[in-house]
Amino acid sequence: MQPNEQPGTGPADTTLEQQDTAAAEVGHPRRIRSFVRRAGRTSTGQQRAIDELGPRFLLPYAAAPLDWEAAFGRTGARRIFEIGFGMGETSAHIAQLRPDDDFLGVEVHEPGVGALLKLIGERGIGNVRIVSHDAVEVLAQMIPEGTLDGIHVFFPDPWHKKRHNKRRLIQGPFVARLAAHLRPGGYLHCATDWEEYAHQMLEVLSAEPLLENTADGFAPRPDYRPVTKFEKRGLRLGHGVWDVVFRKRAA
C-alpha cells in the first residue's frame, strides 16, 4: 500500500467486519490478514506483463517450503521478503539498487502485480519473484524459520479508525512470527505515514525480545528506500513519514 492511501469503507470492509464478528461469536480468534482487497482494473499493459513475464517471475502459492535457489537460479544471495508492494515502484528501485540480493514480494492486488512485472520487464530486473497470495500464509507455509535476511513492510494499511486498530498488521503476535523467520542479524524495516501507527510500530517492535533497535527511536530513512511520489506530495503538505529498523539479536 502506498503512502496516504487509506482502506475504503465499501463492501470489502463490510465483509471483513462481518467475518470478524462471526468468528468472535463462535469463539475463534480474529485472523491476522496482510491485505485489504481493493477495487481496481488491470490495465492492458499490466495484463500483458502478467501474461508474458508471469511464467518466469510469478511463483505459485504452495503449502511447502520455497526452494529459493531454484526460484532465483542462483545460490548465496541474501533473501528479502516484502509484504504488500503496492504498485511496485519501490520494490523495483530497491531490487535494481541491490542486485546481489533476492527479493520475494507478496501482493494480492492484481494491478500492482502487473505494474511490478511491467517495471521488471522495462528495467531488466532479474532478482525479484512474486507470490500473489496472503503474506501471512506465505510466511507460515513457504518460508522456514531462520532463513530471511530482511523483511520490508512499507506503508501497511493504517486502519485509522480506533475501532479498527486491531486489524493492523504490525502487532505483537505477528511481529513475533516475523522475528522467528529472520536469521540472527537479519533486519525488519517498517515505514508508515500515519504518526500514531508509527508510534505503535516502535512500541511493538521494541517489546519483541528477539529484536533490537538499530537507532535511538525512529530510524533515518535508509538510502535504499526511495521517496515515492505520494511521499513527496505528503511532505510538501507537511505530513511526516516514519521508518523503524530493527535487527534480530545474535543467537
Swiss-Prot record:
Substrate binds at K161, D193, T228, K229, F230, E231. The active site is at D157. It comes from the Bacteria. It catalyses: guanosine(46) in tRNA + S-adenosyl-L-methionine = N(7)-methylguanosine(46) in tRNA + S-adenosyl-L-homocysteine. Disulfide bonds: none annotated. Residues 163-168 are annotated as: Interaction with RNA. Residues 1-43 are annotated as: Disordered. The keyword tRNA-binding does not apply. S-adenosyl-L-methionine binds at E82, E107, D134, D157. Keywords: Methyltransferase, S-adenosyl-L-methionine, Transferase, tRNA processing. GO terms for molecular function: tRNA (guanine(46)-N7)-methyltransferase activity. It is an enzyme of class 2 (transferase). Pfam families: Methyltransf_4. PANTHER family: 3-DEOXY-D-MANNO-OCTULOSONIC-ACID TRANSFERASE/TRNA GUANINE-N 7 - -METHYLTRANSFERASE, PENTACOTRIPEPTIDE-REPEAT REGION OF PRORP DOMAIN-CONTAINING PROTEIN. Belongs to the class I-like SAM-binding methyltransferase superfamily. TrmB family. This is tRNA (guanine-N(7)-)-methyltransferase. It comes from Ralstonia nicotianae (strain ATCC BAA-1114 / GMI1000) (Ralstonia solanacearum). The lineage of its organism: Bacteria, Pseudomonadati, Pseudomonadota, Betaproteobacteria, Burkholderiales.
